[in-house]
C-alpha cells in the first residue's frame, strides 16, 4: 500500500534580525549568522558521533567519522543546504542498508533531531531506512515509490526529498570510490549506471563529480 510521505514537525524560524544586517554595518549578515550556526551544529554533531564510537569504527579511507566528515564536506562543495550537509555528517547514525552498524536507535529520533535539527534528522532517517533493492529503481519515477526497511511501509516521498537523498547517496559512494580504488574498480560501472538513471535528481556539481570520479578509467 502506498501512502504519501509526511514530514514530521516544522523547522524553527530564523532568529529576528536587528539593525541593518544585509550590509553588515550594524551586525552580521543573516547569511553569515546561518553559516556560523551551521558550523556550530556540525561541531556538536561531530562530538556526538565521536561519543558513539564513530572515530573507532573502521571504514574505507580510515574511520567512519572521517568518512562522515568527508561526505559532509563534499556536499558543501556542491552547494548543498546546511541541513543536507548535517545529514551527510550523520547519514550512518541509524545504520544503512549497506552498513548495519548503528550509532543511535531509530526509536529515539528526537535525540539526533535535538542536535542537528528536524529537517536534517528526517533526511538521516530517510537515508537509513531505504530498502535499496526496492527503492533505487523507483527513485527517479514520478511517484518515486520508496520502501522503509524498518517498517516495511511503501511511501511516495516528494521530489525535493528524493533529490536530497540522491545527492547524499552520490556523496557517500563517490567518497568511498575516491579513497579506495579497488572498490571503485569493482562497483564503479554499476554506480555510473545508477547515477545516470538518477540524472534528473542530481545537481550539476554532483553529476560532474560522478563523471570525474567513476566514469574515467581507473589508474
Question: Which residues are covered by each model-predicted region?
Answer:
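Charged, compositionally biased N-terminal leader segments and the immediate start
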Residues: 36-45, 50
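Divalent metal-dependent catalytic cores for phosphoryl transfer on phosphate-bearing substrates
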Residues: 51-58, 64, 71-197
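Charge-biased, low-complexity intrinsically disordered regions
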Residues: 194-213
